[in-house]
From Swiss-Prot:
The lineage of its organism: Bacteria, Pseudomonadati, Pseudomonadota, Betaproteobacteria, Burkholderiales. Substrate binds at residues 8-13, 70, 155-158, 178, 183-184. InterPro entries: dITP/XTP_pyrophosphatase (IPR020922), ITPase-like_fam (IPR029001), RdgB/HAM1 (IPR002637). Its cofactor is Mg(2+). This is dITP/XTP pyrophosphatase. It catalyses: XTP + H2O = XMP + diphosphate + H(+); dITP + H2O = dIMP + diphosphate + H(+); ITP + H2O = IMP + diphosphate + H(+). Pyrophosphatase that catalyzes the hydrolysis of nucleoside triphosphates to their monophosphate derivatives, with a high preference for the non-canonical purine nucleotides XTP (xanthosine triphosphate), dITP (deoxyinosine triphosphate) and ITP. Seems to function as a house-cleaning enzyme that removes non-canonical purine nucleotides from the nucleotide pool, thus preventing their incorporation into DNA/RNA and avoiding chromosomal lesions. Its EC number is 3.6.1.66.
Amino acid sequence: MRRIVLASNNPGKLAEFNALLAPLGLDVAPQGELGIPEAEEPHATFVENALAKARHASRLAGLPALADDSGICAHALGGAPGVYSARYAQLAGGPKSDAANNARLVRELAGHADRGAHYVCVLVYVRHADDPQPIIAEGSWFGEVIDAPRGDGGFGYDPHFLLPALGKTAAELSKAEKNAVSHRAQALAQLVERLRLFENA
């Protein structure tokens, strides 16, 4: 198994990445396990944040690094919370928790007829900290935000993210179902394909 560092300590993301990357012979270690502090995320785009996190983790670990920047974008809110998804409630003086973030999103959407939203995931893989050709992949997953949470799986906004075609929220999907269709799975499929192209070039 080849070891790479994940520029995150999010247990939900770590579990998803390990499930999706283990078949490729990659062992994903969270940066906290290697004593690496979290990078700053000062940028206004998912791509810039993911690249900054990947370079930071790779530099401190001396390993290839994979970074994910992801979030949910509500159409009626101009794409908010977007890059601020993980700390959406904090920005309004609330606690940092999934429940608080979901509560703020539902509150902000009250009175809006358009409940459409999409998850975005941008993945950046660097072979080393100064990699001049980082591999960048992106996935989007479209659905609607519902007021009442449903399901016990997933994390983040999943209990409020309804997939109308399936009649389920992301939190009601099995891990296998989610890993087949999620924004992260789409981005990872792109990333794997690009990694293969680079290795065979």
